[in-house]
Structure formats: structure tokens, C-alpha cells
Amino acid sequence: MPISLGNAFIKNFLGKAPDWYKVAIIAFLIINPIVFFLINPFVAGWLLVAEFIFTLAMALKCYPLQPGGLLAIEAIAIGMTSPAQVKHELVANIEVLLLLVFMVAGIYFMKHLLLFIFTKILLGIRSKTLLSLAFCFAAAFLSAFLDALTVIAVVISVAIGFYSIYHKVASGNPIGDHDHTQDDTITELTRDDLENYRAFLRSLLMHAGVGTALGGVTTMVGEPQNLIIADQAGWLFGEFLIRMSPVTLPVFFCGLITCALVEKLKVFGYGAKLPNNVRQILVDFDNEERKTRTNQDVAKLWVQGLIAVWLIVALALHLAAVGLIGLSVIILATAFTGVIEEHSMGKAFEEALPFTALLAVFFSIVAVIIDQELFKPVIDAVLAVEDKGTQLALFYVANGLLSMVSDNVFVGTVYINEVKTALIEGLITREQFDLLAVAINTGTNLPSVATPNGQAAFLFLLTSALAPLIRLSYGRMVIMALPYTIVLAIVGLMGIMFFLEPATASFYDAGWILPHSGDLTPVVSGGH
């Protein structure tokens, strides 16, 4: 029976999302202007942040771009922020946007090499605990020199490869043309294997995700806010590494111990092993690939290997913006592996562009946070504390809590600017400023693993094409990150409270780093 035009509009709104979800979004859109104009803009701002987090939490029901985008458009329309402020945020974060557009697409053209390497690792290491540690350590090591988003893009690319290989065989379809998002053709016997395999991949991805945070906090190139903090403090690569080490080294080792423990104890959704049937399929696939590999395929692997070397060197030496290095990877990889048709290249951009659009919406929410000064009460309260040791601990905690809610790049930037202003005005000494910069950097990087909105890499993982395939939801990510959140946050706080000041003093005595005088760079304007 045909439906009326009115019902058709309702049915089309947010498509297949549940009715209660559609009602919730419409309710948000009605409530926000009322709260903004009639009650309090500050309250309306926090309400908007909570609603946006809700859309992220429901990412498996509906991609957050549409509901989050509607909320952002309304916020701009009613004057919670301005298009100019949103543009300012996007311009300030152009490197992150370029990275998503080009680097993730560049990784797509290297997936044969990545699948080749990681298949060897996956099949070579039988112990799940050792395998988890390998993934966590590799992600941490790479994130210290590359960007965490790049590392996660690599891991996602590999995991989709592994998943689709098994799914094809389990569905009885030929390797060539197959839709790995449909489970209809899978028998009950293999369905159990599939569920176990999903749990196995989920745990590896979460270990790798936390690994990016463990490594990303240690160096000035690991996360975008690290660069901003290092720039404001006038630190170079070596000094940044040394100043962070009293906090980052204990955290790193405790993170690896946590990784091993959750696997051994099989808690928080960890501990799933690779099912034997799946292992056999991957072994058979690897053997088949080896037999059918032509010289042309070998040449492609060599080219991709050389491009991988170029990628690591270029990123470690900061030869260009990350996104531009990604563009060079696309050009080199396609030129030397013979991918020259436009439609073949288009597939590479499918994964990252929806997320790039979502991130643009995210930055418009950040613009609201800036214009409505949502974090100001917290910042003022912490700066008002007289005792230096308490101030350090509070800065770490406040940064950590706000980074769980908002983007850690934004939180780190806002805080370092406020502290820089306090230094210029003579409210704190240069020595205290350097210690606070460490507290801000570690505070934004470590506790923010608690939720996907804190870390861009986690958000990318949650909204990737892989998340629904392996049933990785917002809630599940929060639960799986919980043991890491507790350990990283507490060990980081202990480092700030007990190790940072004495260790920094001993670094000065040893001559590894020198105390800075009042030399300053100008404060970054706006939010970033």
C-alpha cells in the first residue's frame, strides 16, 4: 500500500535509523533554541556538547554526520557561534583535514604490502598475549614518529583485509567479487567462528588504538597538540622527549603490562583467540597468494616497500605537512603500480571523506565551546590555586576530564594559551610554566582514551567501515578502553605528582636540558 507524502518525508528523515532516535534528534533541535534564548547560552552550549556525544555514541544506529550536522547548522543559525569562527577552526586544523583526505587514501594503495607483512605477523605469533603486545608496541612506536590517525588507518586497512578474506571463504563465494558486509550466506557452524573472529579483531584494534596514545604522548610529532605545546614552550624534539619522560615512560610500561593482563585474565572483552578454522583459511590464503604471485606483483610489493620507507622518513623529518606527504604517497604508489583509471582511485577516498566531513562538524561544535566559553570556569578555578604541586595535579585532572568530552587538540591548545598568558602577566614563573606544559600534554593525551571523542584516532576507528563489521560500538569501545583509562590516568597522575619535579631538576643538573629564561613566542589566537 502506498504511503502518504507526509509519511514519506518522515520515513526519509534519517533513513533506517530507529523511530525513537529520529524523535530524539527532532526534540534536540526544538529544545536547543529555547534553552539558548530563554534560559542560558552557557547551559545551551553544554547541552549541545552532550547531544553531539549522544550522536557519536549511537554511531552504529546512524552515522553521526547527519544528526550532528543538523545540530551544528542550527547552532550557527541561532548565533551560538559564527561561520567565521567555524572557518577559523577548520583553517587552524587544515593539517588534520589534509591528513584524512590524502594520507588515508595513500595507505589504501599500500594495502597489499601491509596485508603481506601483517599476515606473516598474525600467523607467525601463536600466543594471543604476545600478538596483542606486538600490536600495542608497534602502534606506540609508529605513533611516536607518525601521526596516530595514519597508524590507525594502517591497522584498519589490515583488519578489513583479514576480515574480508575469511568472510569470502565462509560465505562460499569466490575471492574476487564479494560483499563482506552481508552475513546471510554464512552457515551456523562458521557463524560461531565469525563471532570469535570479530572479538579477536576487536581486541587487536583496541590494543593498537591505545598503543597510539602511549606512543603519541612521548614526542612532539606524535599528536597535533604536542606540536602546539612544544611551539609555545620553545622546545625541540629532544627536549620535549626528555621533559615528558618522567611521566611517559612509567605510563608506557604500565600500559604494556595492562595489555598483557587483560588478555591473560580475559576481562573487558579481551582474550578472544584466533579460531583454528579461521587460521587455516588465512594460511591457505597466504599459500595461494604465494603460489599465484607473479613478478609484476612482486615488483608492486617492492615499490610499496620503498614508498613506506619514504613515508616514515618524510614524516619523522617533517619534510612537509602530513597530508601533502600522503598526496605524494598516492602519486608514487599509483604511478608505479599502474593504477591510472579515475574510478579505481575513487575507492581510496571512500573511507576517509565521510569522516573528514564529520570532523568539520566536530570543529563547529568546538567553535561553540570557544564562543560560549564553556571551559572557562574550569580553567579559571585551576589557575586560581596557589600551591604549585596541587596546581600541576589539578591541571592534569582538568585536562583529562575535558579531553574525554572534547577534542584533546582543542583542550590542549586552550590550556597552553591560558598558561602562556598567565606567564606573560607574571602570575607564574617560567619553571612552573614548563612543568605545567608537561601536565597539559600528558593530561590531554592519556585520560582521553576513555571515550572516542577524546582521541581523533578512536573516533576514526568508531566511524570507519570496519566498526560495524566487527560490532565495535561506542559503548563497547568505552568498556574495552576502561582498564587502560584507569591505569594510564592514575600512573600519569602519579608521574605528575611524584616524579616530574625531581626528575626535571636532575635533568638540569645532568645538563640534558637547560632552564629557559622568559623567552616567549606570541600566543596562538582563538581556539587553536
Curated annotation (Swiss-Prot):
Q: What subcellular locations does the record give?
A: Cell inner membrane
A single GO molecular-function term is: sodium:proton antiporter activity
Topological domains (Cytoplasmic): residue ranges? 1-23, 119-129, 263-297, 341-352, 413-477
Give TM regions.
24-46, 96-118, 130-163, 240-262, 298-317, 321-340, 353-375, 390-412, 478-500
In chain numbering, where does the site feature Important for antiport activity fall?
147
* Ranges facing Periplasmic side: 47-95, 164-239, 318-320, 376-389, 501-528
Recorded catalytic reaction(s): these are: 2 Na(+)(in) + 3 H(+)(out) = 2 Na(+)(out) + 3 H(+)(in)
Cellular component GO terms held in the UniProt record: plasma membrane
Q: Which UniProt keywords apply?
A: Antiport, Cell inner membrane, Cell membrane, Ion transport, Membrane, Sodium, Sodium transport, Transmembrane, Transmembrane helix, Transport
Q: How does it sit in the membrane?
A: Multi-pass membrane protein
Query: Looking at the keywords, is Nucleotide-binding present?
Result: no
Q: Does the keyword ATP-binding apply?
A: no
Q: What is its main location?
A: membrane
Q: Which family does it belong to?
A: Belongs to the NhaB Na(+)/H(+) (TC 2.A.34) antiporter family.
Task: Say what the protein does.
Answer: Na(+)/H(+) antiporter that extrudes sodium in exchange for external protons.
Could you identify this protein by its name? Na(+)/H(+) antiporter NhaB
